[in-house]
Curated annotation (Swiss-Prot):
One of its GO terms (cellular component) is cytoplasm. Its EC number is 2.7.11.1. This is Serine/threonine-protein kinase HRK1. InterPro entries: Kinase-like_dom_sf, Prot_kinase_dom, Protein_kinase_ATP_BS, Ser/Thr_kinase_AS. Pfam families: Pkinase. Residues 1-32, 45-162, 493-578, 614-682 are annotated as: Disordered. It comes from Saccharomyces cerevisiae (strain ATCC 204508 / S288c) (Baker's yeast). The modification Phosphothreonine is found at T495. Residues 215-722 form the Protein kinase domain. The gene is HRK1. It comes from the Eukaryota. One of its GO terms (biological process) is intracellular monoatomic ion homeostasis.
Length: 759
């Protein structure tokens, strides 16, 4: 127990000894009031070590009593101590007579003042009471041992023993150096918390109270460096809580340091109240203060397991991103930074409300009535989520920027289902390539705007296609022979139109989709409902026929970006992408384009054969002509068949020659590139290309390596895409407000395995 208060709490100057001598005279003034103990002032019983004891009004009685106490400790040598009594009494009277006039001339008003403690020292001594002493702490057993070893009472400055102390110092000069070490504290030692005098938090120092109030601890939910979390069901009402059991106290760690670390998290969490921040309820410790328990709100859904299912829709991902950012914004408004944001420190309720947990690494960056930002220091957090400045500028960094970087990494994990890199260090190839400048400059804002226009066009064409399909369903009710006759009559005279119609209806080879269309199709698949499945399939058919025109109409930068995106769609985690598929696709499309443009006669022959087959299938449909006309038609058909066979052999040789030339070109390119024929993409685009177009403008700023260029929370909330996100939340009465357009994925552990639900 620290020495919080000395025996004379309101007398700290050497000149006060003169007043002590005067107050203990044989004829004390009548105006003197014997004050109560300081401990009586704070609600305790009166102490024998009070400022001016009521029992010490007579100086001779007090001196005799103190001398008798000294005599008892000195082997009951009454003769020698009676002499000491006479000496001390004579010295006392002489000092009183010689100094009485001197004290009155200085205007001292100890006699006339009705208040016993000095007004100039009351507040300072009160603060000293609440501040732990720096001196060495001694237990009661040590104090008693020192008393018996020196055979004398502890030195004191009380009014009844001043001369005895002077006499004791004359005989034992070495004893005065250890005055504060021998001084007994005015507050007796207690087994209560060491924080009970300086903190208003009521900490239960008995883990039995935890079991009585909340019940016994249940199964383990998770564990980490700071401790483990277990579930707890209160037997009285069946309410479920999560109890965090902090790590045990280390052998070289003091009780005060351990209590400070454990209670700091509780002090932070108990003051935070937000829909996206976990509620902290209570705190306990065992009798020896070697363990602490924190009672919190229970959320049954593990957010990390939800992300790893890969079943989150785009709307659900955006909703979780906004909820996460709302929680971080609230923390920053309170002057706190989390510094350990990650998927593991996010939990969800059964209604899809995301909450932040674990404030063990939180730090205060803005104090009340201060505008400046207090920099943080130290490497705190998990490696994949760390900001680069935490490693490069360990001694001083802005913790707000660290939280914003972690938000961007969490969003990448939700979209990609993997980490962008293991740690933001130069030794990590992924991060090193990310820090390099882009191979081609990318305008993410313009790309997002163009992509939005493309989506609008596709929606309009999808609607037109649906209307056309309805009309075609009506036309199918007509006789089949009439429709076939019309197609024959329309295709025979105008062969280029028939070629165009054939290519529009049944293209031989379809170009591969660009990254935009792939993302859109995947998004539509994820966000589609049973009512919209037909629209999604129609959308895919339309996009396949329009890729060439959209790529050509795009900006040059956008074209390069899309080309890189096509080339990187199947890349591995290192960003090395096989471009062979892309080159093969381009070669095939070139060959098909040449074949479609140059082989009109071949296509005409195919059309004629189709007409003949239709005529043979339905002989009644062929108009009745003269025998001469029939012979001429048969001759023309034979000639066309011969030409078709010749051209077919000719084009086979041409295609073989082209195939050999393409193979030789590929071999030469592979030899020129070396054994690794994969393209490596440099710069932030290697990561941003995998994210949705609409999110790239703000994500490119959130994931800025330089913290000075990184986006702030105001920039995030002012972003057009982020502001348009509809997120679920709760009102003041804890009622869930669901956002439209998406469902939340829930993962529960049932029957020893995980079950996935949608709410």
């Amino acid at each position: 127990m620290p020495n919080l208060l000395s025996r004379n709490p309101f007398h700290g100057h050497h000149n006060d000894h003169h007043h002590d001598r005067e107050n203990s005279s044989n004829n004390p003034p009548q105006l003197i009031r014997s004050s109560k103990s300081f401990l009586n002032f704070i609600g305790r019983k009166q102490s024998n070590d009070s400022l001016r004891s009521e029992k010490s009004t007579d100086s001779m009685k007090s001196t005799t009593t103190t001398t008798n106490y000294t005599t008892t400790n000195l082997n009951n040598n009454t003769h020698s101590h009676s002499n000491a009594t006479s000496i001390s009494t004579n010295n006392y009277n002489n000092n009183y007579e010689t100094n009485h006039h001197h004290n009155i001339s200085h205007g001292l008003h100890d006699y006339t003042s009705p208040a016993s403690p000095k007004q100039t020292h009351s507040m300072a001594e009160l603060k000293r009471f609440f501040r732990p002493s720096v001196n060495k702490k001694l237990s009661m057993s040590q104090l008693r041992s020192k008393k018996h070893s020196t055979h004398s009472p502890p030195p004191s400055k009380s009014t009844s023993t001043v001369n005895l102390n002077n006499h004791y110092r004359a005989q034992h000069p070495h004893g005065f150096t250890d005055h504060y070490a021998h001084t007994q504290s005015a507050i007796p030692p207690s087994t209560d918390s060491i924080l009970s005098l300086s903190n208003n938090i009521n900490i239960y120092h008995d883990d039995c109270i935890l079991a009585q109030k909340y019940g016994k601890l249940g199964k383990l939910l998770g564990s980490g460096a700071g401790g483990s979390v277990k579930v707890l069901v209160r037997p009285t009402d069946g309410a479920t809580f999560a109890v965090k059991e902090f790590r045990p106290r280390k052998p070289n760690e003091s009780v005060k340091e351990y209590a400070k670390k454990c209670t700091a998290e509780f002090c932070i969490g108990s003051t935070l109240h937000h829909p996206n921040v976990i509620e902290t309820v209570d705190v306990f410790s065992d009798s020896k203060q070697n363990k602490y328990y924190e009672v919190m709100e229970y959320c049954p859904i593990d957010f990390f397991a939800v992300v790893m299912t890969g079943k989150m829709s785009r709307g659900e991902i955006n909703c979780c991103l906004k909820q996460l950012t709302e929680g971080v914004k609230y923390l920053h408004s309170m002057g706190l930074a989390h510094r350990d944001l990650k998927l593991d420190n996010c939990v969800m309720t059964s209604q899809g409300i995301l909450k932040l947990i674990d404030f063990g690494s939180a730090v205060v960056f803005r104090y009340p009535f201060e505008d400046g930002v207090t920099m943080a220091h130290g490497i705190v957090g998990s490696d994949p989520y760390l900001a680069p400045e935490v490693i490069t500028s360990t001694k001083s960094y802005d913790p707000q920027c660290v939280d914003i970087w972690s938000i961007g990494i969490i969003y990448c994990c939700m979209v990609l289902k993997r980490f962008p890199w293991k740690a933001p260090r130069d030794s990590d190839d992924n991060f090193r390539l990310y820090c390099m400048p882009d191979d081609i400059e990318h305008d993410y804002v313009e790309s997002a705007r163009h992509h939005e226009e493309l989506l609008k066009e596709r929606k309009e064409k999808r609607q037109r296609f649906l209307n056309h399909s309805d009309c075609s369903a009506i036309n199918q009710q007509q006789p089949a022979h009439e429709s076939n006759l019309k197609t024959v009559q329309n295709q025979v005279p105008n062969t280029p139109a028939s070629i165009q119609g054939k290519s529009d209806n049944k293209p031989d080879i379809v170009e591969e989709e660009t990254e935009e269309n792939k993302e859109d199709d995947s998004n539509n698949d994820k966000e589609s409902t049973p009512d919209n499945d037909k629209e999604s399939t129609i959308d895919i058919k339309i996009s396949k026929n329009e890729n060439k025109s959209t790529v050509v109409s795009a900006n040059p930068k956008k074209v390069d970006a899309d080309a890189d995106a096509d080339c990187d769609a199947n890349g591995d985690s290192n960003g090395r992408v096989d471009c062979k598929a892309n080159s093969d696709c381009n070669d095939k499309t070139d060959c098909n384009a040449n074949n479609d443009c140059s082989n009109e006669s071949d296509c005409n022959a195919k059309v004629d054969t189709n007409v003949n087959t239709a005529a043979n299938a339905n002989p009644d449909m062929v108009p009745q002509n003269n025998p001469q006309q029939q012979q001429q038609q048969q001759q023309q058909q034979q000639q066309q068949q011969q030409q078709q066979q010749q051209q077919h052999h000719h084009h086979q040789h041409q295609n073989q020659d082209k195939a050999h030339s393409i193979a030789s070109d590929n071999k030469s390119s592979q030899q020129h590139r070396g054994p690794h024929h994969k393209k490596i993409i440099h710069g932030p685009y290697r990561l941003l290309r995998l994210l949705p177009h609409a999110s790239r403008p703000i994500m490119s700023r959130i994931l800025q390596v330089d913290p000075k260029k990184r986006a702030t929370l105001d920039d995030i909330f002012n972003d057009e895409w982020f502001a348009a996100i509809a997120a679920c939340t709760m009102d003041s009465k804890n009622k869930v407000i669901r956002a439209p357009g998406h469902h939340h994925t829930l993962v529960r552990e049932e029957n020893a395995h995980l079950e996935t639900y949608k709410v």
